[in-house]
């Protein structure tokens, strides 16, 4: 059975979706079969970070309804080990049938080694939907005080839900800004109260790749792309140092 990983954030604007896309493509490049699901109902944008823009047409709701099976999910044209389901645009997270969603995920676990759920920011129904079924949770935060405080609150909520494997990714790390603020990644980790999975540097290539409709890991090999590869290796259980660049 495959492993289900929820990619979460307490605060919007942390770059969670770009991190999710980077991890998914890195896992696929490493040879793992991956299904990436955009769970931000009504506000989907994971397709952009994957370099698919609006070409991704199959939503997870169609699989939940039985219109398609998991073996019919389209593969990424550049990453044959990566499949993608977009979010439906004309419903609310509260409208998702939990039993149908659970059945879809069970089927997905049988087809893929990793299932990544890109959850909406915050602690509402979409967050609970993704976290409830996750084997592991990856919490993405920035370094600004509001983001770190929200990450700590989100971690507490996950603990209350019985989620014990929760790890932190600090995104958009700028060493000059850290120096000016007189903080370190260790400070962010301590304030969030979570173990560290990885650090992703501030990188203009993330925005440029999306603008040119390119997957980040195809657009560049450095910066944020390299950081996502290191995170993927750690998720695979491989020894990989955490670097701050």
Residue ranges: model-predicted function:
Residues 211-245:
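NTP-binding/hydrolysis catalytic cores, primarily Walker-type P-loop NTPases
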Residues 99-103, 107-202, 208:
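Conserved catalytic-core segment of NTP-binding enzymes
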Residues 9, 38, 86-89, 119, ...:
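Flexible glycine-/small-residue-rich
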Residues 21, 25-29, 132, 153-156, ...:
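Short, well-ordered alpha-helices that flank and scaffold nucleotide-derived cofactor binding pockets
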Residues 36-110, 210-217:
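P-loop/Walker-type NTP enzyme "switch/lid" segment
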Residues 2-39, 108:
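Walker A/P-loop phosphate-binding motif and the immediately C-terminal alpha-helix
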Residues 12, 46, 63, 118, ...:
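Residue-level signature of catalytic and energy-coupling elements of molecular machines
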